[in-house]
Swiss-Prot record:
One of its GO terms (cellular component) is cytoplasm. This is Lysine--tRNA ligase. It comes from Rickettsia massiliae (strain Mtu5). Gene3D superfamilies: 1.10.10.350, HUPs. It catalyses: tRNA(Lys) + L-lysine + ATP = L-lysyl-tRNA(Lys) + AMP + diphosphate.
Amino acid sequence: MSEIWEDAIKSNAWPFVEAKKILDSLNGKIPEKGYVLFETGYGPSGLPHIGTFGENARMVMVQKAFEQLSDIPTKLICFSDDMDGLRKVPSNIPNPEMVAQYMDMPLTSIPDTFGECESYGHYMNAKLRSFLDKFGFEYEFYSSTNCYKAGMFDEMLIMVLEKYDEIMELMLPTFREERKATYSPCMPICPKTGKVLQVPIEKWDAKAGTVTYKDEAGNYIEVPVTGGHCKLQWKPDFGMRWAALKVDYEMYGKDHLANARLYSEICRILGGKPPVQLCYELFLDENGEKISKSKGNSISVDDWLKCAPVESMALFMYQNPTRAKRLFFDVIPKNVDKYITFNQKYHLEEDRAKRFANPVYHIHHGNVPQIETFGITYSLLLNLTSVCNPSDKSVLWGFISKYEPKATPNTSPYLDHLAEFAIRYYNDFIKAHKSYLSPSEKHKVILQDILDMLSDIADQTEAEAIQKAIYDIGMKAGYENLRDYFKDLYQILLGQNEGPRLGTFIKLYGVQEMKKLVEGQL
């Protein structure tokens, strides 16, 4: 354990950094409850998106890193805020006008617009659990509705009434004058309508365990805060949950950062110890806007997994969690190829600290599979797909087998999967956007030079030699920036702005096939 500890800390990999923070907060001792509790949260107002997966994937990376550093048992819970009142109707669900009739109702009290589960909230929870299960996450699922109604939070809710003034003193300075007049940490569930009410509380009684408010007719209504008859506002709810469940580690998006101090103070007021926390940056869409469950303006988990292996998605989640990243379809090929590179480096590396620093160690929780692609990248397969437009992967294997006779679907099942993924990605995201550049007279001279070069080279010419020859043709053509030269070639030959190292691509595609491609543009 001491050797692992030393190398883990030396690696400076962020899951180990976080794990050490947790261990330090415990002074290396087992908590009274007997385990360290990791918590992730889910707001089921809309369909789970890739950010939801990301939070859970990162959390498990920290949990597994902690287990490497300590023998203290751990538990992960995924908490769904499914008792929240509906504030906004998502745009990416069926029958939104039906859902709009249930504004302010708890999500588990709204009919399922998909027609599959007992409520809208239950459907969203099922969607979350199904894809968490698919990735083998080991977790316990907690429903806010169930926790409130089963009395799990009753003791804390009574304490909220006992500490009511102290909580209000903390919360009120964070609001505008208008909101201060109506705010209460407690939101009664209306006995008549079932709605979550944001109303001023006229009276609270810690001994009786009740709050009193005025209804629309001016009548005083007294309700218990226990047994699911009241819910806390989301900020006090966050801190209360930490205290009630004795959470040791939580991560949340940057949109929570401004309120993190409030969560921690509420937790302390209620007698708890705030957990170690990590604030991660949010994902942005291609326009730089925050991705949203209700907008559905993001790549879905299904989109990614249709076109690439799950470990490429996990790699995207691992990298720089505290830095904002754009999440759009172009990131998929880049992360597949990054994963291949990291995987190969991991198995060549003998230094354990450097292995611990490699993302694939954390993606696979220490059990890193060995893959073989014979130097063929996902991007190269995409470009091959782009020029031959195959109906199935056997067409790609025809080129792969000529390039590397040792490569077969059996000797490289990973490469076989990538070939299938490449065809799907091409059909979904490249094919419709291809736009060819008509060659100018200058371009035709360049293409003829490339054709002459290809006619002169021997079959065994290495990719680097071909690449240099193409580079020299660009230099001779007088381009100030060779990036423009290669961009022109990609647009003329592939119908896209970016492309592969042409030397490697020609070796894979074949010299004779490349000559036909060039001739077709002359």
